[in-house]
Amino acid sequence: MAPSNLPPVFNATSQDMEMLLAAQCHLGSKNLQVHMDPYLWKTRPDGINVINIGKTWEKIVLAARIIAAIDNPADICVISARPYGQRAVLKFAAHTGAVAIAGRFTPGSFTNYITRSFKEPRLIIVTDPRTDAQAIKEASYVNIPVIALCDTDSPTEYVDVAIPTNNKGRHAIGLVWWLLAREVLRLRGTLATRETEWDVVVDLYFYRDPEAEEAKELEEAKAAGVDEIGPGAVESGFGAEGWEASAGTAFGAAAATTTTTNPATATATWEATGGDWASSAPAEGWAGEAPATEAKW
């Protein structure tokens, strides 16, 4: 790591550097844009370009100082069309007061005042210049400064401040947004001193797969159900005596109801039907033919 050009108060701690390395913020892609060459440390034998995380930290501090210089936090727009960065921008907006656009960027949001999503921010921050190209293009039309998380292969056209980092890994994206939010709060004075620990853990900025979370909740619910039943219930037969008693009572009540109600209902019904058949003309004809049939048999 090259020596830092920042004042001592802005220098990164060893813990910050360890977090950047653990999140693989230093691992770029195999391609290299010419404008990202100053941020390159070396190229590994397998072709992966390694980013100088000292430069990454310097750009995080520079971006935080730009953000803190804007009086109204609502004039800052944070954008991420990449799924891995959507949770991070929403959390960043919640903690700093910025406006978040997570998901698809509606074309014309910065240039077409007729649209409902029209905005006039003083600064935009994007997760990936390639996936958020529409937002950067419109910002260039209306002279909005752009801060972007740039990988080694990211286009830097119309990007004013490039933060060199891995912008494809969910941990790298979440960590950079978390560090940026923390530095902004420190510069605003929300965190009393630089030694004060931020009580928001970095895990909140990481992307979470909805399907994986759902499956995890189902497994936890199943495990909780097994624990509630327990081995004691299995050995005792799940309260078989109670089931027999309740079943016997239920069937006994049903039988009693049938015995008391059915005969009366049946008698009344058959009497009415018998009277109808007796009074009808065809019934007499059948009664006359019956003895002849008995004689034949």
UniProtKB/Swiss-Prot annotation:
It is found in: Cytoplasm. Transmembrane segments: none annotated. SUPFAM superfamilies: Ribosomal protein S2. The keyword Ribosomal protein applies. CDD domains: RPS2. InterPro entries: Ribosomal_uS2, Ribosomal_uS2_C, Ribosomal_uS2_CS, Ribosomal_uS2_euk, Ribosomal_uS2_euk/arc, Ribosomal_uS2_flav_dom_sf. GO terms for biological process: ribosomal small subunit assembly; translation. Residues 276-297 are annotated as: Disordered. Keywords: Cytoplasm, Ribonucleoprotein, Ribosomal protein. GO terms for cellular component: cytosolic small ribosomal subunit. GO terms for molecular function: structural constituent of ribosome. HAMAP family: Ribosomal_S2_euk. Belongs to the universal ribosomal protein uS2 family. Required for the assembly and/or stability of the 40S ribosomal subunit. Required for the processing of the 20S rRNA-precursor to mature 18S rRNA in a late step of the maturation of 40S ribosomal subunits. Component of the small ribosomal subunit. Mature ribosomes consist of a small (40S) and a large (60S) subunit. The 40S subunit contains about 33 different proteins and 1 molecule of RNA (18S). The 60S subunit contains about 49 different proteins and 3 molecules of RNA (25S, 5.8S and 5S). Interacts with RPS21. This is Small ribosomal subunit protein uS2.
